[in-house]
């Protein structure tokens, strides 16, 4: 059996007689090789019943891509044997059954706007839905699935910035929301907190996902600009408190911190930046699982960091520095205003996604992870992945999500 993965070579000497263990290969190559071997040596009907079948979908897809890319006439390593078309077909069948189902639901006006951003960005491997009490606004949303909630409570006219009305509206359409979320393994609930519909419905939607459907539930929300007033901020903080109690992790992006990134933007443009940050956060988390890359993570990796992660914050960095673009991008992420006044040494976990052009090496991505590891609690759980986007040649982007850290 021979497998090619990212210029690494695995040949028979790497396997023992049972074909179950792999020595002398990278962690990623090890995982893929084990996966392919399992599907050869273990009855498929038995393997499909195991929990691992859910966790390793992205790695199956890697194996498919690898087996396709290898020319059947090539011989790399003495005694290597080509992956047959029969194995390709079996892998395809298993991959189809093992897809991790990821659903993103935008609540209220802000959450629905973020869904539009997700549609434009073409997030790979996620289903999108927008819910709102405002019928006119919902008409402007390009989501594949839209739910007008609270027809009786609001008659399609909005929640009037009253969270209790937003919650009642969601309860009115509970069955439809539940039906949309059914089958999800990961649910992102996104909203701009402070108004009526998003603030009132987000925690209700999250409770369905978490408690009824046992999905890994991640809130991704913004807090209002100071200029939006005291009442809106009070509503937002009350809504955040309810949301964090039902989500595994709640990623919070304070809008005022965005102004430190783009201080000269008018407030309407700043709202669009907030939508963009929300979208990029969910895109990064989704595609680190679903999109083939140099180093992918699977469902269990994400669950390790996000399960009971509490309040979390995001940092974003980018650099094309010729001297040391990795260090520059990571330091920008670590010092991002979006992380706020948190103590990284208290962090329970961190997830790092590194994206670069075709010139990026695994060594660079690994160094990014090492810099973050040295900056946080030594007992924090750190996971990282990296992928290639050819248009980023010369540039490296870093998405950092820190869980469990407390404000200073």
Specify the residue positions occupied by each region the protein language model found.
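Short, basic, low-complexity termini and linkers enriched in Ser/Thr/Gly/Pro
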Residues: 1-3, 8-10, 23, 53, ...
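Aromatic (phenylalanine/tyrosine) cluster motif
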Residues: 4-8, 15, 41, 47
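Periodic, rod-like helical contexts
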Residues: 13, 24-31
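N-terminal polybasic/positive-inside topogenic patches
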Residues: 17, 30-37
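Tubulin/FtsZ superfamily GTPase core signature
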Residues: 22, 36-408
């Amino acid at each position: 059996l021979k497998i090619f993965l990212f210029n690494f070579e695995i040949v028979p000497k790497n396997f023992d007689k049972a074909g179950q263990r792999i020595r002398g290969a990278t962690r990623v190559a090890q995982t893929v090789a084990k996966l392919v071997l399992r599907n050869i040596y273990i009855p498929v009907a038995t393997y499909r019943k195991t929990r691992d079948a859910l966790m390793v979908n992205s790695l199956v897809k890697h194996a498919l891509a690898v087996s396709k890319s290898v020319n059947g006439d090539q011989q790399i390593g003495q005694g290597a044997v080509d992956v047959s078309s029969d194995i390709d077909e079996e892998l395809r069948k298993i991959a189809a059954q093992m897809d991790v189902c990821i659903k993103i639901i935008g609540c209220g006006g802000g959450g629905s706007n973020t869904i539009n951003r997700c549609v434009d960005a073409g997030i790979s491997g996620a289903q999108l839905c927008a819910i709102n009490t405002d019928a006119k606004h919902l008409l402007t949303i390009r989501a594949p699935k839209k739910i007008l909630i609270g027809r009786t409570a609001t008659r399609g006219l909005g929640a009037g910035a009253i969270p209790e009305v937003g919650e009642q509206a969601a309860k009115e359409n509970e069955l439809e929301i539940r039906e949309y979320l059914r089958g999800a393994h990961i649910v992102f609930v996104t909203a701009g907190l402070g108004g009526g519909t998003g603030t009132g419905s987000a925690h209700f939607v999250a409770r369905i996902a978490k408690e009824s459907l046992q999905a890994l539930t991640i809130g991704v929300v913004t807090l209002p600009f100071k200029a939006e007033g005291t009442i809106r901020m009070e509503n937002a903080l009350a809504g955040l408190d309810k949301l964090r109690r039902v989500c595994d992790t709640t990623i919070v992006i304070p809008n005022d911190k965005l102004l430190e990134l783009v201080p000269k933007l008018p407030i309407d443009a700043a709202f669009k930046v907030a939508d963009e940050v929300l979208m990029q956060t969910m895109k990064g988390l989704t595609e680190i699982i679903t999109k083939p890359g140099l180093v992918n993570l699977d469902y269990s990796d994400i669950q390790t960091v996000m399960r009971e992660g509490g309040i979390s914050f995001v940092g974003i960095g980018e650099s094309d520095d010729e001297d040391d673009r990795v260090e520059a991008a990571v330091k920008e992420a670590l010092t991002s205003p979006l992380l706020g006044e948190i103590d990284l040494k208290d962090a329970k976990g961190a997830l790092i996604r590194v994206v670069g052009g075709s010139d990026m090496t695994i060594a660079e991505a690994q160094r990014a992870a090492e810099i973050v590891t040295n900056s946080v609690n030594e007992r924090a759980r750190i996971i990282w992945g990296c992928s290639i986007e050819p248009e980023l040649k010369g540039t490296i982007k870093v998405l950092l999500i820190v869980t469990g850290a407390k404000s200073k």
